[in-house]
UniProtKB/Swiss-Prot annotation:
Domain of life: Bacteria
Organism: Stutzerimonas stutzeri (strain A1501) (Pseudomonas stutzeri)
Name of the gene encoding the protein in the UniProt record: atpA
Top-level taxonomy: Bacteria, Pseudomonadati, Pseudomonadota, Gammaproteobacteria, Pseudomonadales
Annotated site location: Required for activity: 374
E.C. number: 7.1.2.2
Transport found in the keyword field: yes
Keywords on record: ATP synthesis, ATP-binding, Cell inner membrane, Cell membrane, CF(1), Hydrogen ion transport, Ion transport, Membrane, Nucleotide-binding, Translocase, Transport
Name the UniProt record assigns to this protein: ATP synthase subunit alpha
Primary residence: membrane
Length: 514
């Protein structure tokens, strides 16, 4: 046998190394090291990217969320009970996508877009990424078209525009979902497509919402995305992004859409659970450091986009049309504490908030909208002209009434002006009450506001204000149908409409005693 000296040995090793193709070795396969609480640790997968889909045996998928030096932390989408240590895991090279398009309207789907309503498969023609970058500043347009919620208190004092993010915030069981559902019901003839995302709710509650939408003819215009309380934290975390992608389909094609997130507090809790299981360091209230980004990247996707954006997106197929996605996120507070971590985050991200107060709700004022701390930062420019003109004194009357009511408890005798202000405030408060599932048209709303603004309620008993309003609206829709139709179509306020409303109310009061 030939003897090799050390220099020859090193030369042979160098040649062998040069000939071997290390780069061609597979780096996109790994081994499951541990499985617990829906979190999988995988050794290997050197080429995996953040947010990439990982495939396990048996058609189970996960999503890579933690990329560490020698392992990957992934969250399993769906049932993880079939996964065991030692199983193989593969990179797919794809990010999570959900079906989009008009085929989803009228259906109930889970966070991955699979139908769960028993009505058969959905033959969607397209899919789109769940996580997308929001449109840039250059592609956006200012909010100047209204979204009518059908609630007097909201449309008059806290108007919502197309492309706005308006937060609905309040304690549990106070009417937050009811307000959002009524806003969806009111869009059935407006051309605005709706998406309702239920996060961490009871399945009975979701079924009730779907039934109510169907009863009022609004389900055919709505996509319901449901990640109920029994679903994994991963699906509750992903559901809002999936719903947003489905809504963006309409926005990007020059249509208008409305999305309700019910509610983002539960999404934050699900994300906190995932982050703690992934051993990320906890911060305030044990939430991870990026919980603000969790909501900001979601809510920034709601926007009004320009004609150029729509034209560029559709390759010239749609021209001269703007698109919008309006968001109504819901946040649940604990004992009215709006200064907690998640509520303050979402208040700072959104363009205003509708604050519902439990004291008002318990006093029978429903919707329990607190006009004092509720605000719409951009909706004023989008408000219908007639409603804007007639609602100017409503917020002031309510604010003054609340201040005087507190003061009047201590004062024994009040002067005439103060007494009149108090009585006017009581009547306006009564007028702002509205039943659930009874959204109002612009004309009906304008008539109520006109009666309050011009002092026609002054001689009506406080207890009879609601009945007076209903009788007045019924009278106008019967006797002055043309005027009401004109207000609904145009939404303008001029001397002719002013005179018509005045003459009609005077005729009503002359023929009926209140």
């Amino acid at each position: 046998m030939q003897q090799l000296n050390p220099s020859e040995i090193s030369e042979i090793i160098k040649q062998r190394i040069e000939k071997s193709n290390v780069a061609a070795q597979a780096r996109n396969e790994g081994t499951v090291v541990s499985v617990s609480d829906g979190i999988v640790r995988i050794y290997g997968l050197a080429d995996v990217m953040y947010g990439e889909m990982i495939e396990f045996p048996g058609g189970i998928f996960g999503m890579a969320l933690n990329l560490e030096q020698d392992s990957v932390g992934a969250v399993v989408l769906g049932n993880y009970l079939g996964l065991t240590e030692g199983m193989s895991a593969k990179c797919t090279g794809r990010i999570l996508e959900v079906p989009v398009g008009p085929e989803l309207l009228g259906r109930v789907v889970d966070a991955l877009g699979n139908p769960i309503d028993g009505k058969g498969p959905i033959n969607a023609q397209a899919t789109d990424a769940v996580e997308k970058v929001a449109p840039g500043v250059i592609w956006r347009k200012s909010v100047d078209q209204p979204v009518q919620t059908g609630y007097k208190s909201v449309d008059a004092m806290i108007p919502v525009g197309r492309g706005q993010r308006e937060l609905i915030i309040g304690d549990r069981q106070i009417g937050k979902t009811a307000l959002a559902i009524d806003a969806i019901i009111n869009q059935k003839n407006s051309g605005i497509r709706c998406v309702y995302v239920a996060i961490g709710q009871k399945q009975s509650t979701i079924a009730n919402v779907v039934r109510k939408l169907e009863e009022h003819g609004a389900l055919q215009n709505t996509i319901v995305v449901a990640a109920s309380a029994s679903e994994s934290a991963a699906l509750q975390y992903l559901a809002p992004y999936a719903g947003c992608t489905m809504g963006e389909y309409f926005r990007d094609r020059g249509e208008d859409a409305l999305i309700v997130y019910d509610d983002l507090s539960k999404q934050a809790v699900a994300y906190r659970q995932i982050s703690l299981l992934l051993r990320r360091p906890p911060g305030r209230e044990a939430y991870p450091g990026d919980v603000f980004y969790l909501h900001s990247r979601l809510l920034e996707r709601a926007s009004r986009v320009s004609e150029e954006y729509v034209e560029k997106f559709t390759n010239g197929a749609v021209t001269g049309k703007t698109g919008s996605l309006t968001a109504l996120p819901i946040i649940e507070t604990q004992a009215g504490d709006v200064s907690a971590f998640v509520p303050t985050n979402v208040i700072s991200i959104t363009d205003g908030q509708i604050f519902l107060e439990s004291a008002m709700f318990n006093a029978g004022i429903r919707p329990a909208v607190n006009a004092g701390i509720s605000v719409s930062r951009v909706g004023g420019a989008a408000q219908t002209k007639i409603v804007k003109k007639l609602s100017g004194g409503i917020r002031t009357a309510l604010a003054q009434y609340r201040e005087l009511a507190a003061f009047a408890q201590f004062a024994s005798d009040l002067d005439e002006a103060t007494r009149k202000q108090l009585e006017h405030g009581q009547r306006v408060t009564e007028l702002m009450k509205q039943k659930q599932y009874a959204p109002m048209s612009i004309a009906d709303m304008s008539l109520s506001l006109y009666a309050a603004e011009r002092g026609y309620l002054a001689d009506v008993e406080v207890a009879k204000v609601g009945a007076f309003e209903q009788a007045l609206i019924a009278f106008f829709n019967r006797e002055f149908a043309d005027l009401m139709a004109r207000i609904n179509v145009k939404g303008d306020f001029n001397d002719e409409i002013d005179a018509g409303l005045k003459a009609g109310i005077e005729k009503f009061k002359a023929t009926q005693s209140w």
